[in-house]
């Protein structure tokens, strides 16, 4: 087995679509392991020889669910994916070829597109609205709510194509547009077809199964959910690895940031979010990661300047542990 795709899922209505799209587009010796975190999938995932579905009796969280899937994985490489993604044709083969080129001391991702999963459509008058929380038709009103349904689209949109990410001093995820206009990004994109990124968004990453465990990229003590892109990138870079984006493939990710019934599947209290950020900051800022050989200041200097960081904050970090 070359690649194991790990999909943690809790109340994910597009898990079936995600798995079916992956199966349609894989071209390598790839398996899919989905962990249903307490709740059964609805609609149900169809049986397939390449797909393993596990259900936990109670919710264990996204990190623990991903780790459970990785314990069962048979592939040399593992790819963690959110349960609402679409895929480039041959994305698994292209990523495996990418690792053959760059080596295994890497965490890699394809280009991230935005997934246009569905439109809302009123099947009485034909009114449509782009994906989001369940709307009320302005023409027919709430009394015709039963005529409002999702019309599936499942398109990885061509814009934006996200390839550069960072985090600020909080730490909080940010897109890193400035980096895309500097060297070595410009030359690497043109001559190599892949580029370095300071951090990750977190909906997808690929790594050897050995490094997944060795670099401790999915620490359950960080909390059930959130901050995973930063955690994976920090664990990789500060352990002596590289975080690279392969520009020869892509995946589409559906963003759910509008609340109501179009929000995150795990509880997201401000207290829990802060707890995760504090844990990540204390672990990496204070050089507590078990395989850490670089300070966070080393990573900042590599990508400096970075929006959301001041020169004083950088100098303060450089003095930690010295």
Where are these regions (language model features)?
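N-proximal low-complexity "stem/linker" segments adjacent to membrane-targeting elements
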Residues: 1-21
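Short, acidic, metal-binding catalytic loop of nucleotide-sugar glycosyltransferases
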Residues: 20-29
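Short beta-strand/loop segment that forms part of the nucleotide-sugar
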Residues: 28-40, 52-56
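Glycine-rich, basic loop-to-helix element that forms the pyrophosphate-binding segment
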Residues: 57-72
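A recurrent flexible, glycine/aromatic-enriched loop bordering the glycosyltransferase active site
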Residues: 63, 181-206
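Short aromatic/hydrophobic "clamp" motif used to bind/position activated sugar donors
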Residues: 78
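Conserved donor NDP-sugar-binding/catalytic core segment of glycosyltransferases
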Residues: 86, 90-171
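A short, conserved alpha-helix in the catalytic core of glycosyltransferases
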Residues: 95-96, 204-205, 210-216, 222-249
């Amino acid at each position: 087995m070359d690649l194991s795709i790990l999909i943690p899922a809790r109340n994910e209505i597009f898990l079936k679509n995600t798995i079916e799209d992956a199966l349609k587009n894989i071209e390598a010796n790839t398996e899919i392991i989905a962990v249903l975190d307490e709740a059964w999938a609805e609609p149900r995932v169809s049986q397939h020889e390449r797909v393993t579905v596990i259900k936990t009796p109670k919710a264990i969280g996204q990190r623990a669910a991903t780790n459970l899937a990785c314990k069962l994985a048979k592939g040399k490489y593992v790819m963690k994916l959110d349960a609402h993604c679409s895929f480039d044709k041959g994305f698994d083969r292209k990523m495996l070829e990418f690792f053959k080129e760059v080596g295994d001391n890497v965490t890699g991702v394809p280009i991230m597109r935005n997934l246009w999963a569905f439109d809302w459509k009123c099947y009485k008058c034909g009114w449509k609205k782009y994906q989001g929380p369940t709307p009320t038709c302005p023409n027919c009103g709430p009394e015709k709510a039963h005529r409002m349904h999702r019309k599936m689209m499942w398109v990885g949109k061509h814009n934006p194509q996200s390839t550069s990410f960072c985090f600020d001093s909080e730490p909080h995820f940010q897109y890193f547009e400035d980096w895309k206009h500097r060297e070595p990004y410009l030359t690497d994109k043109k001559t190599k077809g892949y580029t370095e990124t300071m951090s990750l968004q977190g909906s997808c990453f690929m790594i050897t199964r050995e490094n997944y465990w060795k670099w401790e990229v999915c620490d359950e003590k960080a909390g059930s959910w959130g901050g995973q892109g930063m955690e994976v990138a920090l664990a990789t870079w500060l352990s002596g690895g590289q975080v690279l984006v392969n520009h020869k493939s892509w995946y589409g990710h559906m963003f759910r940031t509008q609340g109501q019934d179009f929000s995150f599947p795990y509880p997201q209290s401000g207290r829990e979010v802060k707890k995760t950020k504090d844990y990540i900051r204390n672990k990496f800022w204070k050089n507590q990661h078990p395989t850490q050989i670089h300070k966070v200041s080393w990573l900042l200097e590599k990508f400096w300047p970075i929006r959301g960081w001041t020169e004083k904050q950088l100098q303060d970090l450089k003095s930690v542990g010295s």
